[in-house]
Amino acid sequence: MPKKILVLHTGGTISMQADDSGAVVTSQENPMNHVSNPLGGVEVHALDFFNLPSPHIKPKHMLALYQKIKEEADHYDGFVITHGTDTLEETAYFLDTMEVPHKPIVLTGAMRSSNELGSDGVYNYLSALRVVSDDKAADKGVLVVMNDEIHAAKYVTKTHTTNVSTFQTPTHGPLGLIMKYEILYFKTAEPRVRFDLDRIQGLVPIIPVYAGMTEELLDLLPVDQLDGLIIQAFGAGNVPKETSQKLNALIQEGLPIALVSRCFNGIAEPVYAYEGGGVCLQKAGVFFVKELNAQKARLKLLIAINAGLTGEELRAYMEG
């Protein structure tokens, strides 16, 4: 029997076209729906699930994708999601933390619209179909396929505003490569905690630190309306002295605060014991999130809060 793959189109550049002025605009009809399937033994069904530029994607849309995949799990052997690249990594990470079926799930997109010179959409789409129909993809977690590379949802990030090789995995490198005749994997997926949520809500902003930062910016936050806070810290995980004093006060008020590094490579860890250093921050109750960027750490905290995690259980999850 042929493998059945469900494609969920959500919009983004891969579905768009450039108009006469060169501006890229939303298309009424997704050009990927007209791409012929060259893969033998693979039956492709496509659904226009959303038609949104990815800056318009919210956690509620990510949850809807998860629920659709669960709903269709018994009818399909794998799932491809076409998505705008600006928030693709966040949707991929969200799905990777959910109790998705043990079947391949691949996200892909494009950096150039369908009628631009050098358009990459069709190639990435067909590459995603190749990966999702490959038996080796089933135990790799949620994947991102772009530009002949396969990346783990947890680690991949968009690194360039326009380059077709924008999706990279800092520190680790790609999970695998798409070759002319075969698909090669370097690594296996890591075990992870998964959740089955039926709602996702809450306010968790991201605050980057900078030289000379004081408590004034944090004072402007509507703390009584916040569910958590992500701090994008210096280096291994440090903040200015005045900022740390305010963070300590917020933690005392019961606000969960998680920290990542603003560095592109490396992992945040408590190293320095001066005021504002990571050692002091962790002792005060700040969670040090390993190997995630700020936008994914935000989703991780939001998911944990919606799953009802608190206290040491929340700390263990955020720092695990």
Which ranges hold each PLM region?
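Accessory alpha-helical/coil subdomains and C-terminal extensions
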Residues: 2, 8-12, 28-38, 152-231, ...
